[in-house]
């Protein structure tokens, strides 16, 4: 028992003060400093009596392991260091053992860790309650309901990556043993305006991003969705990706959680179909169309999105399209139908999307309740966990912040009331004199908001219901008239003159002084958001849907049950929900967790004192401490108190044999503690001043040191004596054992020596006999060897003699043959010399005869005259040829192939050279006429000829078409100003192409832009850039050999641009686009771009390789090529 007490006391090894009730001195500075000191040492939990303060560490800490759960299980609240598990265990044991219904109220601003705190409470309760197959199933369903609700109800905000955008209260039901039976979840005020619009830097609800990131291609195709976030107007793009968040993995977690909770596969698919319909609603756009009566009527621009929504929801397209264009108003038995202008149509679209998602979320909560509710009807114990919005103060505060802060005011009110009530009940229960405590009661603020006569909500409802023109300005005027004199209401236009010159208070705003501080509310949107109107035509269109889930979400659309009453406003609904919640909480024993956000950067190890100070003030933590300390700062049961301090008194140490209260009285009397510093309750000792407790702790610490010294002294003496007696006994035993060992060793030595001597003698005799036998054997072997060597010597001598005889005979034959050969060669040489002399004489004689003849007949030759005649004739022929060529010259057109024929054969080479020189000359003359722009065009045409002539059937039709490049004139069209500003480089091509969808083969119009360094794709409607591909990442362009405009752009594997796969386009200017892409890539990368022309080639779509095959189309397909995705591996293009 002592060991356990020393190990686990709240006051031992304390960093700062674990319970701020004991903080001395108590002020705001010391309170914050205590929290910071504990935060820096990873002590994120601190007590205010039974209230737990939790500071968000923004990182994982090893303090929630199963071992920690066991440490806090069935332990006294103050027995261990502060922890959320201690409060959870206290609440669970009170529910199980004392049959008291519990509620755990978790409050704090957004990002303070409320959602995580609620998860920890539920996980602890699940870990410590009973086991069994049925119990485990209930626990698992309760825990897995959280991921489902977080996916549909949480979103990333600037303050919190997983901010709850709805309030959740869960009643967990237990049986008499403390085992969970089920639960009931209530949700409050889902922030449905986030569906259609999100502030900058924030995201829509998680489920939209999880669905697009984690769903399979088959599911996306079924839901008619694409993975590209930019395709949907309701999704913010600047924060689509969140660091450290894997939306794909979270989607799998949500699907698994839905299955565990009890959703069937058809139900889960129906939910995802509604989510997809909400996403696609945001893509519906309207255009004005004038009617004959002069009024503008809204018409849908592109009905493809509307068609897909109707296919998803099984709604008649005509009915839904009319609901977006007309509004029907019913009054008694009259119906009036009016057209909607474009602004009203957009309002109707957004209202439908918000209502569809909000009702889906409510249906999810009800469906989860059906699965987790208790199946038995026996009496149940209940533990409620409240996780609701924290107090919100933004730069722009609207109706949502007003409602949220109203809820927090009510929670603060019940916190003050229940805290004081609990404190008072404990004093009465312990029979301690009660001291009245003064505190700020925020009931006046709650009354300002909720008063049925002149409260802000009542006036807002009155303004929404009155006939005539109702605007936000008229509502503000009404507030200025009724609330002007209220001390917590401020307005620039009120009758109160002190705010007339307040420049911090705009004319279109009002300010309320909440318990957390002053909040400025923008009045814009209060009336619309409170009305929350959905046109009856849209409700009826939804009720007519063939989709069972959607039909069930809009029961008011049933024409047979038309209700002409105005539906309750959002404010009145929320007020009623809060009243029900407060009534529920007041029936339970409260447990509080106050969550604090240490910084706005969502970073670990950063503690912003100013931010924490602000939260401490509006949470009223110092006031809570003062309430706790108003009577007695510390209280403890008699048994643990006596167990902890009994060593301070000789009468109680080491064991007290009487009642624990008597022991504590003896102890305090012995220590001479003043009587006014403490009081004895029925089961507890109450200490008034923290200094008294710290004095007890100092005395206990000093006494523990003295006891430790005494224990060490006695232990060392006992250890030395024990060691001496052991050594003495050991000496006797060792001597006896040594004598035995010495005799035994001597005997063994003698015995082993005799054995060694015997072994040596036997060995010597054996070796002697062995030597004699070996000598005899060697003698016999030596005689045989000598005889063999002698016979071998005789044989080798005979062999050498025979070889010498044979060698002498061969040498004689060789010498004789060499001499005969030498003689023959000399004779041959003599005969050759004689023959050469005879031939030389004959040659000299012939030359001599020729010389004599030439000398005799030289006077008869006319060599000079013939040469001159030949040269003259040749010159005349050439002159005549050139004069004729001058008169017969062809035209200067480079394509003219005419050329005069040659008159003589010997002029053939000259004729051809002249033709070549003339053609080069006229080509140069032709080129000199062109400007640089014309030269570039002809170079591109020449490049196109080399790439596609006789290879692509489409090429001949492109020869006569000039290459323009900029078909869209982006610089002149104001629609594309944003696109023009986003591109700083020179635009080489600007053309509208059809981008082929990778999933279904359908085409989507895109703007194709080619610059010096990049290839870009932009949305044709908005001009927003969808994809940007550096030219260095383009590896190949593939196309067919037929007369079609399809081509594929292949991207480098592993590059960022290739994450979704290659692109497949269709264009009427294929030849021009491919040629310019080839030349630009060559200029940028110094490498030729591979142009593949084949009727069948492969493209990479994400992780799959898909074959693109060109086939001959049927006549019924018309004259336009069509593209169709056959399966995961084949995409066919039918070419007419």
From Swiss-Prot:
Keyword set, alphabetical order: Actin-binding, ATP-binding, Calmodulin-binding, Isopeptide bond, Motor protein, Myosin, Nucleotide-binding, Phosphoprotein, Repeat, Ubl conjugation
Domain IQ: 704-729, 730-750, 750-778, 780-807, 808-837, 837-866
Gene Ontology cellular component list: actin cytoskeleton; actin filament; apical part of cell; brush border; cell periphery; cytoplasm; early endosome; endosome membrane
Binding site for ATP: 108-115
Organism encoding this protein: Rattus norvegicus
Modified residues (Phosphoserine): 60
Region (Actin-binding): 592-599
Entry-linked SMART domains: IQ, MYSc
Annotated TH1 domain residues: 952-1136
Gene name as annotated: Myo1b
Glycyl lysine isopeptide (Lys-Gly) (interchain with G-Cter in SUMO2) crosslink location in chain: 287
This protein's name: Unconventional myosin-Ib
InterPro entries linked to this entry: IQ_motif_EF-hand-BS, Kinesin_motor_dom_sf, Myosin_head_motor_dom-like, Myosin_TH1, MYSc_Myo1, P-loop_NTPase
Family: Belongs to the TRAFAC class myosin-kinesin ATPase superfamily. Myosin family.
Superkingdom to which the source organism belongs: Eukaryota
Covalent link (Glycyl lysine isopeptide (Lys-Gly) (interchain with G-Cter in SUMO1)) residue numbers: 287
GO molecular-function term, one example from the UniProt record: ATP binding
GO biological process, one term: transferrin transport
Mitochondrion is among the record's keywords: no
Function: Motor protein that may participate in process critical to neuronal development and function such as cell migration, neurite outgrowth and vesicular transport.
Record-annotated Myosin motor domain positions: 15-701
